[in-house]
Amino acid sequence: MSLDIVILAAGQGTRMRSALPKVLHPVAGNSMLGHVIHSARQLSPVGIHVVIGHGADAVREQLAADDLNFVMQDKQLGTGHAVAQALPALTAETVLILYGDVPLIEVETLQRLLKRVTPEQLGLLTVKLDDPTGYGRIVRDDQHRVCAIVEHKDATDAQKAITEGNTGILAVPASHLQDWLGRLSNNNAQGEYYLTDVIAMAVNDGLVVATEQPHDAMEVQGANDRKQLSELERHYQLREARRLMAAGVTLRDPSRFDVRGEVSVGRDVLIDINVILEGKVIIEDDVVIGPNCVIKDSTLRKGVVVKANSHIDGALLGECSDAGPFARLRPGSVLGAKAHVGNFVELKNANLGEGAKVGHLTYLGDAEVGARTNIGAGTITCNYDGANKHKTTLGADVFIGSNNSLVAPVDILDGATTAAGSTITQNVPAEQLGVARARQRNIEGWKRPVKITKD
């Protein structure tokens, strides 16, 4: 059965008190609308149609993709009117309607809903709530069949007592949708064209309204203000924490842990408090991540240890390598197996061979470092001449003394040593000592300056 998905994302979101369109406000590092689109793609539709209005240019700019069709709703005249704007582009047998400010909806829930759709039956997602204030109420007959949805502002006191609420998410046979939308009226308290009115039309036309419910009511929670947005954020993070713990991760405190991307994990991983995982992160078995670390778009091989307060971005850490505390690995950094990067070390586009050591207070940019090479404290690669970047190459078993400046381009070959305090501007041959510093001179009779005293 072919599927079109319509995502309603035209609302202004005035209660957010923001110039940013409501659907672009982030949850876990991705916009709310971005989460909905991600779920929609997993259903393999023939088309994803995003109805936009307020802040349309910003939405297009942030989320433009070949598989998205943006449809303009110039005037916000209700959800039924919004879906009608997408009608000319719909070609599939079934239409699923989602909302751009409901980011936590699970793909499995939508799959169950879609299974309810036949040419003579539509699927409606409802939710049981302790306090359904603000939700449209699901009205059922004496045989428990859905017969209508009544919006909260139009409901009688008896209808307001109903605890089954409408989520707005429904899947309908496309063959009926155009007719129902054409018959909508705005004769209601809001003066809008309610999509929910198609339920009563379907019943009157002899169709069955089959309902499904999410496993968790937060799946269908929207965000109309910053408080609700924060609630979605926290629920998402706890959900991700539970998923990782089920996969074999120990989290010191699941409430102090954030995922802001796509994370895959091995077994027996230990993650301390205040760790943020961003982008695409791969963590293999037996990895340990200390507190207050950020890991972004990186791969941590088996047995890696990242110590406290380290920032790893776009890096590959080989088996049993370690970094930190207070290490910064920037994009293009690679640590070979058992390589060591210590405190206050920054790497950028640098490749450390197996067993190489950079203990502390060092910057290596655009560098190739051979196996077992040791780099002393205070060393920097001078890789930028003001116009272009240049490479520093260190062979295997090199020893770089403390407080060295390696002025690229420069090669220091296998087994070479550089003396402490050197500024290396020329290649150092294998097994030789490079010394590049002024000779020490001791001045006899020298007197320290004396502070001038004021009268």
Curated annotation (Swiss-Prot):
Catalytic activity: alpha-D-glucosamine 1-phosphate + acetyl-CoA = N-acetyl-alpha-D-glucosamine 1-phosphate + CoA + H(+); N-acetyl-alpha-D-glucosamine 1-phosphate + UTP + H(+) = UDP-N-acetyl-alpha-D-glucosamine + diphosphate
Pathway assignment: Nucleotide-sugar biosynthesis; UDP-N-acetyl-alpha-D-glucosamine biosynthesis; N-acetyl-alpha-D-glucosamine 1-phosphate from alpha-D-glucosamine 6-phosphate (route II): step 2/2; Nucleotide-sugar biosynthesis; UDP-N-acetyl-alpha-D-glucosamine biosynthesis; UDP-N-acetyl-alpha-D-glucosamine from N-acetyl-alpha-D-glucosamine 1-phosphate: step 1/1; Bacterial outer membrane biogenesis; LPS lipid A biosynthesis
Renumbered residue ranges of the record's region Pyrophosphorylase: 1-226
Residue numbers annotated as active site: H360
Main location: cytoplasm
Region (N-acetyltransferase): 248-455
Cofactor annotation remark: Binds 1 Mg(2+) ion per subunit.
Entry's Gene Ontology BP terms: cell morphogenesis; cell wall organization; lipid A biosynthetic process; peptidoglycan biosynthetic process; regulation of cell shape; UDP-N-acetylglucosamine biosynthetic process
Broad class of enzyme this protein falls into: transferase
Gene Ontology terms for molecular function: glucosamine-1-phosphate N-acetyltransferase activity; magnesium ion binding; UDP-N-acetylglucosamine diphosphorylase activity
Family designation: In the N-terminal section; belongs to the N-acetylglucosamine-1-phosphate uridyltransferase family. In the C-terminal section; belongs to the transferase hexapeptide repeat family.
UniProt-recorded name of the protein: Bifunctional protein GlmU
Organism: Pseudomonas syringae pv. tomato (strain ATCC BAA-871 / DC3000)
